[in-house]
Amino acid sequence: MAAEVPTFKLVLVGDGGTGKTTFVKRHLTGEFEKKYIATIGVEVHPLAFYTNFGEIKFDVWDTAGQEKFGGLRDGYYINAQCGIIMFDVTSRITYKNVPNWHRDLVRVCENIPIVLCGNKVDVKERKVKAKTITFHRKKNLQYYDISAKSNYNFEKPFLWLARKLAGNPQLDFVASPALAPPEVQVDEQLMQQYQQEMERATALPLPDEDDADL
């Protein structure tokens, strides 16, 4: 009998239009096997990753756009074991709303590992710069710049969460999942520049005022 694959419920939250559905749909098997839960209006995408300790699966709960009509129901968050909060680096308001998403999530699921992702870094008109992104440091979250449409850093949030959930920093992905072909290309030099800016910003002390520079 095949061993049971460790499976974790992952809630994906953030303002409408930040690219959450685009992001989760990059993983082709998850997109093929997704299930719709009509009672709470959610699509669940089972995303499998292969690690040096065997297969791991994230059941990614995607809101199917409900967040545009106000907050999400508790049923969405209940029993979540990890989370991704997404904002759009070309839209300041989506970053400004991150604390609300975080508050709703931790109110229901207290001590779960959470990754904050700034999506759309492929777009040249970046509005939310590295020095502004401090929320993850205040709340002990992990942060990654991502670009769903180019697959840039797609695996990073999942690898960080998998290590946290397994309690093993040595865990690694040994094979890449089948991803949809990139719709856009990222500028590698610009990505390196963003990464350096993020490293420099992380070395600075946190501002006293809450998000005074927003």
Curated annotation (Swiss-Prot):
Region (Switch-II): 65-81
One GO cellular component term: nucleus
Tree of life domain: Eukaryota
Keyword Manganese: no
Chain spans, region Switch-I: 34-42
Binding site residues for GTP: 15-22, 65, 119-122, 147-149
Ranges of residues in domain Small GTPase Ran-type: 4-168
Gene Ontology MF, one: GTP binding
Location within or outside the cell: Nucleus
Keywords: GTP-binding, Nucleotide-binding, Nucleus, Protein transport, Transport
Quaternary organization: Found in a nuclear export complex with RanGTP, exportin and pre-miRNA.
Entry protein name: GTP-binding nuclear protein GSP1/Ran
Species assigned in the record: Eremothecium gossypii (strain ATCC 10895 / CBS 109.51 / FGSC 9923 / NRRL Y-1056) (Yeast)
Lineage: Eukaryota, Fungi, Dikarya, Ascomycota, Saccharomycotina
